Design a protein with these regions (language model features):
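Conserved AMP-binding loop of ANL adenylate-forming enzymes
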Residues: 84-118
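Residue-level signal for inorganic ion chemistry
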Residues: 1, 55, 156
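A short, flexible beta-alpha/helix-coil linker loop
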Residues: 61-62, 102, 188-192
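Active-site diphosphate/adenylate-binding microenvironment
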Residues: 3, 7-10, 14-54, 62-66, ...
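Conserved ATP-dependent adenylate/AMP-binding module captured primarily in the ANL superfamily
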Residues: 77-93, 140-148
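Active-site glycine/GP-rich loop and adjacent strand/helix microenvironment
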Residues: 108-109, 118-195
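"Short basic amphipathic alpha-helical interaction patches in structured regions
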Residues: 65-74, 110-114, 171
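Short secondary-structure capping/junction motifs at helix and strand boundaries
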Residues: 62-67, 85-96, 124-130
């Protein structure tokens, strides 16, 4: 980044007054995450950008932007697959998604959450969305999923705020056996702070 992003180089030189040699991840200098909102920090040539990841903008109107090239995208997918394999095993498990399919089917709703759901779906099979388009629990769909898949390991994925604000409530009020479920939750914690 230091060699390929002039703004990043300016920040590092301004904070540390010298070029830092980072031989391991622990040596990479920390920078305020807010810089990704206020500055275009990209070490990828514009023509090589495959996608741009954006934050949710929960703490303000301005979103952080991270520019991804093809190699980085492939590395991310391999890294995630390797990490999940240690948790979920080698076979794709039936997947209960604690979200609505509207989070990615409708371009109007497509955001970081929708992209996150789509990205995680490749690691599961026999997908079941636990929430309807109004983000209310679909108890019948959940019960049907558990009837078919609940006796063996299955994968549960959702964003933290939906796990606690929507799914946790339905668990308290219904006799659902999720003992074979493997829950992975991600992001959405800022929305919980608001509550």
């Amino acid at each position: 980044h230091y060699s390929n992003c002039s703004r990043y180089k300016q920040v590092i030189d301004g904070l540390w007054n010298s070029k830092i040699l980072a031989n391991k991840i622990e040596d990479v200098p920390f920078i305020p995450v807010s810089l990704f909102k206020s500055h275009e920090l990209s070490s990828v040539n514009k023509e090589d950008i495959r996608s741009t990841m954006t934050s949710s903008g929960t703490t303000g109107q301005t979103v952080s932007k991270i520019y991804i090239d093809t190699q980085t995208s492939q590395d991310q997918q391999k890294g995630l697959a390797n990490s999940l394999q240690h948790i979920l095993g080698r076979k794709r498990l039936p997947m209960l998604i604690l979200d609505t399919d509207a989070s990615f089917k409708n371009p109007e709703y497509m955001n970081a959450r929708g992209a996150g759901v789509l990205g995680m779906m490749r690691y599961g099979r026999s997908h079941c969305f636990a929430l309807n388009k109004d983000l209310e629990p679909d108890l019948e769909a959940i019960k049907d999923f558990l009837k078919i898949n609940g006796s063996a390991p299955f994968f549960i994925f959702g964003f933290t705020f939906l796990v606690w604000t929507k799914f946790h409530e339905i668990l308290k009020n219904n006799n659902l056996d999720l003992s074979n479920g493997i829950l992975i939750h991600s992001g959405g914690w800022k929305k919980m702070i608001e509550n």
